Amino acid sequence: MAKIKIMPCLDMREGRVVKGVHFVDIADAGDPVECAKAYCAAGADELALLDITATVEKRATLADVVKRVAEVCTVPFTVGGGINSVEAAGVVLKAGANKISTSSAAFRNPQLIPDLIKEFGVDAVTVAIDVDVNPALPSGYEVYIDGGRTATGFDAVEFAKKVDGYGIKTILPTSKAGDGAKTGYDLPVIKAMHDVCNAEIVASGGAGKLEHFAEAAEAGATVLLAASVFHFHMIDIPELKRYLADRNFDVAL
C-alpha cells in the first residue's frame, strides 16, 4: 500500500489565506506564513499554496508570498495559480517552491507540460484539473478552467489520461461541486483517474470529516488535500493521521 500524505492547501488572495465554497463566497483564514508554520509543526507531509485569482486576473503568482512561506516551510511545497509559462514557473521555483502546479494554461496549451518537465524535471510539475459533473460526457465529468469559471466541454478523465501520457507524476483533480462544501471528496472522479493513470492522484475538494479522508484513500488517492477543515480547526492533522493509521493506512506519524 502506498504511503498516504496529508496536504493542507493555502488558497491565496491579496496576500491572505482565504477559503470559499464552490470556488466563491470567500472568507479570510489567516496569514500564509503563520499558517505554513503551524501546518509544518502539526505534521503536514506536504503543503500547497494556490493563488486563486492569478489566472483570471492575468498576472503572475505572488512570488514575494512564496518566498516568505518557503522560508518557514519544512515540507515539500507546491505553488499554483498563474503558472502559464516556463518563465513563470521558474520565478516561483526560484522563490523557494519545490513544485509548481499548472491548470488552465496546461489545458489551453498541453505542450507546456513537456516543456516544464524538460526544464525543471518531472518531480517538480503537478497538473491540476478542476472538474464538475456533466452527464453528457463519457466519464460524467467536465474540465473547467479559469478558477472554475469556464466550462470547456472536454471530458476530465480523458484529459487526465492525456496528461498522464506525458509522464507526469502528480495529477490534482478538484471537484467544483465539492470545493469547501465539506460533504466529502468526489470519489468517482478520484477512482476513474486512478484507474487510467500511472500518476499519483491528489484528492481535493470536499473534505468535511475524518471518514472522507479514508474514503478518498480507498478510492485511490495517495495525497489528501484539504483547506477549510484545517484552517478553521475542525480537524487537526495528528488526529487525522491517527484515524488513518488505526484503519491500516500507511501514514507518517
Model features per residue range: what roles?
Residues 11, 39, 47, 79, ...:
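Conserved, mostly hydrophobic/aromatic
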Residues 60-67, 110, 152-157, 183-191:
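Charged helix-capping and loop-helix junction motifs
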Residues 112-120, 214-253:
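C-terminal helical cap(s) of enzyme catalytic domains, especially alpha/beta-barrels
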Residues 53, 61-122:
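Glycine/small-residue-rich loop that forms an oxyanion/phosphate-binding "nest" at active or ligand-binding sites
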Residues 5-10, 19, 47-49, 77-81, ...:
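Hydrophobic faces of well-ordered beta-strands that scaffold small-molecule active sites
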Residues 12-14, 18-19, 93, 97-173, ...:
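Conserved anion-binding
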Residues 73, 77-100, 188-224:
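Catalytic cores of alpha/beta
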Residues 46-65, 104, 172-183:
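Glycine-rich, proline-tolerant flexible connector loops at the mouths of alpha/beta enzymes
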